Amino acid sequence: MIRVGQLEIRYLQEAGNGCQIGCFELRVPPASNVPPPHSHAANEELVVVLEGTLRYTVGNETRDLQPGDHMSTPPGTVHGFSNPHAVMARALVINTPDIGAQYFREVGAIIGAGGPPDRVKMMATMQRYGLVPAGPPATAN
């Protein structure tokens, strides 16, 4: 089990031996801190909710996904998730190619170091694994 702040990640399949797919279970407690919206330079992502309700956004579409519901994210598309509901949300996340469990271990170490996360280290780690933080929302003039 990999802890990233309040989130729990349990890898079921990591890329290797010719396999490009990564698959993990993601547990998101109610009202937990989650990663900021971001995109993956080269990874497709599929999220399938197993338990609870997960709010998931891909581009401009936001849905509250129930068990059995899914959303997919093409490479380069901004996406994010949250759990504003009263119960734990659990989802199966599939990436191709795999980002790798080591990414989550590194981010977990940065977040778990105490105090506010080191933004420079976090951005460097994200960049190394092909994650691109979304820019701030556009403002009306």
Please provide the spans of the model-predicted regions.
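A short glycine-rich, His/Asp/Glu-containing loop-to-beta-strand
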Residues: 2-37, 43-44
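Structural motif
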Residues: 8, 46, 53-55, 62, ...
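Ligand-binding loop in jelly-roll beta-barrel domains
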Residues: 19, 55, 75-101
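Residue-level recognition of specific faces of alpha-helices
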Residues: 20, 45-48, 103-106
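Short, conserved beta-strand element in jelly-roll/cupin
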Residues: 25-29, 39-57, 94
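Short glycine-/acidic-enriched loop or helix-start segments at secondary-structure transitions
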Residues: 59, 67, 82-83, 103-104
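Short acidic-glycine-tyrosine-enriched beta hairpin
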Residues: 60-78
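Double-stranded beta-helix
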Residues: 87-141
